[in-house]
Swiss-Prot record:
UniProt keyword annotations, A-Z: Cytoplasm, Hydrolase, Metal-binding, Nucleotide-binding
Molecular-function annotations in GO: 3'-nucleotidase activity; 5'-nucleotidase activity; exopolyphosphatase activity; metal ion binding; nucleotide binding
Nucleotide-binding as UniProt keyword: yes
Matches recorded under PANTHER family: 5'-NUCLEOTIDASE SURE, 5'_3'-NUCLEOTIDASE SURE
Its biological purpose: Nucleotidase that shows phosphatase activity on nucleoside 5'-monophosphates.
Protein name (database record): 5'-nucleotidase SurE
Subcellular location: Cytoplasm
Cofactor stoichiometry and binding remark: Binds 1 divalent metal cation per subunit.
Pfam families assigned: SurE (PF01975)
One GO CC term, this protein: cytoplasm
Entry cofactors: a divalent metal cation
Gene label: surE
């Protein structure tokens, strides 16, 4: 298959190198377009007031891989690849392997997930894959799982407009407990801004904080991605770009009937 690979950790991150090389060795036609530097937590931002530059990268990936390092955001990378760099559209966009999980509300900030979502917006099935650790650097189990997942999706394709957000425990493959389909969990942060002063006497702030994970127990629903990783399971969460709250449409329709006279329309 033709694969476009992006990330948000940048061209020198070991996760994207392991992923791209593994998929190229498996026989896929791989193109990498990723940021030229660290771009984590940039969300789905695009560069609209500056030029975007893309430089060919050599001697970083497997010899069969074409690669560019882009000055823009992760979403820029996918948009530029699809609109200008690639001769043919890919069969899949794969974003990762991210250093650190993308669970719960992380997905709203994640450049990794946003790069994959850009593919879905353009009508291309996409996968975001993350290793659930900031300190473990063995990306091979996650890369091997991605290869198997792509084979499965080739035989049984995704429905349209679906992104698979995959989180892999940072464990040897033999210690991973299995694979489960999950829903988005709750993972918040108790933010803390550290106030500091630079050498010129100017005040600045450094964002820190603690992760707060919730484990709601509901036997009538699928487990959450947060629960799955806590149980050493690979989490696969289907996402889409439609953020409409379905029940809210019905509730607000009823609400509008009650307040309609106040609008004088």
């Amino acid at each position: 298959m033709r694969l476009l690979i992006a990330n948000d950790d940048g061209v020198f991150a070991p996760g994207i190198r392991t992923l791209a090389d593994t998929l190229a060795i498996a026989g896929h036609e791989v193109v990498v377009v990723c940021p030229d530097r660290e771009r984590s937590a940039t969300g789905h931002s695009l560069t609209v007031f500056d030029p975007i530059r893309a430089e060919v990268v050599s001697d970083r990936f497997h010899p069969r891989i074409k690669a560019w390092a882009c000055s823009g955001t992760p979403s820029d990378c996918v948009k530029l690849a699809l609109g200008a760099l690639l001769e043919q559209p890919p069969d899949f966009v794969v974003s990762g392997i991210n250093q650190g999980s993308n669970l719960g509300t992380d997905i709203l900030y994640s450049g990794t997930v946003s790069a994959a979502m850009e593919g879905v917006i353009e009508g291309i099935p996409s996968i975001a894959i993350s290793l659930a650790s900031f300190t473990v650097h063995d990306f091979q189990p996650a890369a091997d799982f991605t290869n198997r997942l792509l084979k499965a999706l080739e035989n049984a394709p995704l429905p349209p407009k679906v992104l698979l957000n995959v989180n892999v425990p940072a464990l040897p493959a033999s210690e991973i407990a299995g694979v489960v389909i999950t829903r988005q969990g709750i993972r918040r942060y108790h933010d803390l801004f550290q106030k500091r002063v630079d050498p010129r006497g100017k005040t600045y702030y450094w964002l820190a904080g603690e992760v707060v994970e919730e484990y709601p127990q509901d036997p009538n629903q699928a487990p959450t991605d947060v629960e799955a990783i806590a149980q050493n399971l690979i989490s696969i969460t289907p996402l889409t770009f439609d953020l409409t709250y379905g029940q809210g449409v019905q509730d607000l329709t009823e609400w509008l009937r009650t307040v309609q006279p106040l609008f004088n329309l």
